[in-house]
Amino acid sequence: MYALTQGRIFTGHEFLDDHAVVIADGLIKSVCPVAELPPEIEQRSLNGAILSPGFIDVQLNGCGGVQFNDTAEAVSVETLEIMQKANEKSGCTNYLPTLITTSDELMKQGVRVMREYLAKHPNQALGLHLEGPWLNLVKKGTHNPNFVRKPDAALVDFLCENADVITKVTLAPEMVPAEVISKLANAGIVVSAGHSNATLKEAKAGFRAGITFATHLYNAMPYITGREPGLAGAILDEADIYCGIIADGLHVDYANIRNAKRLKGDKLCLVTDATAPAGANIEQFIFAGKTIYYRNGLCVDENGTLSGSSLTMIEGVRNLVEHCGIALDEVLRMATLYPARAIGVEKRLGTLAAGKVANLTAFTPDFKITKTIVNGNEVVTQ
């Protein structure tokens, strides 16, 4: 048992000064005034840093020089372990490894690997995000068109049978029958709209069928026009739909993030959609069967198509504060509490309270990570 002291604590709801977080057996035992700590307890100083729940990234293709995509060798427990270690350096304690449009065979391998990883590493990766393959070719982005397809009963059944390790599926609502969306949602999978050319009417039909999330708002969806709001307009119009947004200033203009925040409130989640260069020093990598080039913060293919980001969660937090003018407490909720709610893990993650998993991060006022704790263990100390 130990207590984190001498920092500013953000519980997920409020900032507390002169308080401590007591950690024991991998869980938060209490959040209490420093004056109430037992005299014999070990105290670990935060040296004035801000202590927050660990960040939760619900869309992450790769980082730390690796990708959970493309090949049987890459879709492995080892890749997920490398991604977790890279994440921890940027304050991210939990994430959804994202496997983009690929073959049935590699999807099934991803499920097997996820099951093995979850048995070995609790409260870190939180299940698989399958981004595709039921997308609209018009909005495929960097996804391999040879693998984009319509749903078939066998694959739908397989996903539902493995819903305990598949947390989220991204699909184009106009390409997937309502009964398939409902079946996935009823199995306990978060169904997300993305890589879609849906009209407002098609998007709303998808929402009624069971879609509760939207993948990287504004990206890989039609422009909003006066007569046709499209998927983006539907997301902004529907109060209960969660969505992720990439806050690197390259995927989405900061003015659009501000507008989305005004409309979506507590349903807007920070995501990175990161790829191998995040937390690594590389200039190119393979993604969706293509060479992707990393230059000046951009990840693009040979045609200039955006192909994921190099963003880390702490960089996204800083960008939302410094470039969007969103208050720090609300930005931290966008990186912790709101994604936890979106994927249904808020009872154990996303806030600092007694009984919650002790996944936390600490950072300086200039957004440098000083400490990351996973299951009560300090995994990063700087």
From Swiss-Prot:
Documented activity regulation = Inhibited by high substrate concentration and by products glucosamine 6-phosphate and acetate. Completely inactivated by the treatment with 5,5'-dithio-bis(2-nitrobenzoate) or 2,2'-dithio-pyridine (2-DPDS). Inhibited by 1,10-phenanthroline and EDTA.
Q: EC number(s) of the enzyme?
A: 3.5.1.25
Q: Which UniProt keywords apply?
A: Carbohydrate metabolism, Hydrolase, Metal-binding, Zinc
The record's remark on the cofactor is: Binds 1 divalent metal cation per subunit. The highest efficient metals are Zn(2+) and Co(2+), followed by Mn(2+), Cd(2+), Fe(2+) and Ni(2+).
One annotated Gene Ontology cellular component of this protein: protein-containing complex
Please give the knockout or disruption phenotype noted for this protein. Answer: Synthesizes high levels of glucosamine-6-phosphate deaminase and over half of the amount of glucosamine-6-phosphate synthase compared to wild-type.
Recorded GO molecular functions are: identical protein binding; N-acetylglucosamine-6-phosphate deacetylase activity; zinc ion binding
Outcome following mutation: residue 59 to H: Large decrease in catalytic activity and substrate affinity, and increase in the average amount of Zn bound to the protein, suggesting that an additional metal ion can bind to this mutant
> Known catalysed reaction(s)?
N-acetyl-D-glucosamine 6-phosphate + H2O = D-glucosamine 6-phosphate + acetate
Binding residues annotated for substrate, in chain numbering: 142-143, 219-220, 227, 248-251, 306-308
> Which one Pfam family would you cite for this protein?
Amidohydro_1
The biological processes this protein is annotated with in GO are: N-acetylglucosamine catabolic process; N-acetylneuraminate catabolic process; protein homotetramerization
Give cofactor(s), names only.
Zn(2+); Co(2+); Mn(2+); Cd(2+)
Where, by residue number, is the active site? Answer: 273
Uppermost EC category: hydrolase
Q: How does activity depend on pH?
A: Optimum pH is 8.5.
Q: Where does Zn(2+) bind?
A: 131, 195, 216
Q: Which domain of life is it from?
A: Bacteria
Q: In which pathway does it act?
A: Amino-sugar metabolism; N-acetylneuraminate degradation; D-fructose 6-phosphate from N-acetylneuraminate: step 4/5
Inducers of expression: By N-acetylglucosamine. Induced by low extracellular levels of magnesium via the PhoQ/PhoP two-component regulatory system.
Provide the function of this protein: Involved in the first step in the biosynthesis of amino-sugar-nucleotides. Catalyzes the hydrolysis of the N-acetyl group of N-acetylglucosamine-6-phosphate (GlcNAc-6-P) to yield glucosamine 6-phosphate and acetate. In vitro, can also hydrolyze substrate analogs such as N-thioacetyl-D-glucosamine-6-phosphate, N-trifluoroacetyl-D-glucosamine-6-phosphate, N-acetyl-D-glucosamine-6-sulfate, N-acetyl-D-galactosamine-6-phosphate, and N-formyl-D-glucosamine-6-phosphate.
On assembly, the entry states: Homotetramer.
Similarity annotation: Belongs to the metallo-dependent hydrolases superfamily. NagA family.
Q: What is this protein called?
A: N-acetylglucosamine-6-phosphate deacetylase
